[in-house]
Amino acid sequence: MALVASGSAQANQTISNAALSERVQTSDEWIRTRTGIQSRRVSTPDESLNDLAIRAGQQALAMAQWEPDSLDLVLLATSTPDDLFGSAPRVQAGLKAQNAVAFDLTAACSGFLFALVTAAQYPVSYTHLTLPTILRV
């Protein structure tokens, strides 16, 4: 098993510690010394998790040189879905991965690890899938 491609996307807006300290009782120095964080990305009203996930997925597909309809699984690991019913099916539709099963996995900071393990185990449970195909997620 191997990871053969990846994609990433980030929100367009940046908020500095100084701007954050105007909203909550803190300071740039307090945040920076305890976390090392200087700024963070936040979605604008016209950006959603789905948009970011679709962009990242498109990058991964391009890097791997795979067509979206070759995907068997779209697994979205997030603690911030766009709605309570999950975002993976919308990402699947946005990627045009009509042959893929799509579901969300919510596991906070360990979400990536759980998603990786789940994706690796998926072809074991569903033997009609091939391992290279499932890793196209």
What do these predicted ranges mean?
Residues M1-L73, L95:
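Conserved "HGTGT" condensation-loop signature of ketosynthase/thiolase-family condensing enzymes
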Residues A2, L75, D104, T130:
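Conserved beta-strand segments that form the floor/walls of ligand-binding pockets within enzyme
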Residues S8, A107, T133:
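Short, glycine/acidic-enriched loop or turn micro-motifs at the edges of active sites
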Residues R32-D51, T78-Y126:
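Conserved catalytic cysteine-centered active-site region
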Residues A56-M63, V91, T118, Y122, ...:
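Short alpha-helical scaffold segments that flank and stabilize functional sites
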Residues T127-T133:
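Conserved small/polar residues in nucleotide/adenosyl-binding loops
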Residues R136:
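Active-site glycine-rich loop that binds ribose-phosphate moieties when present
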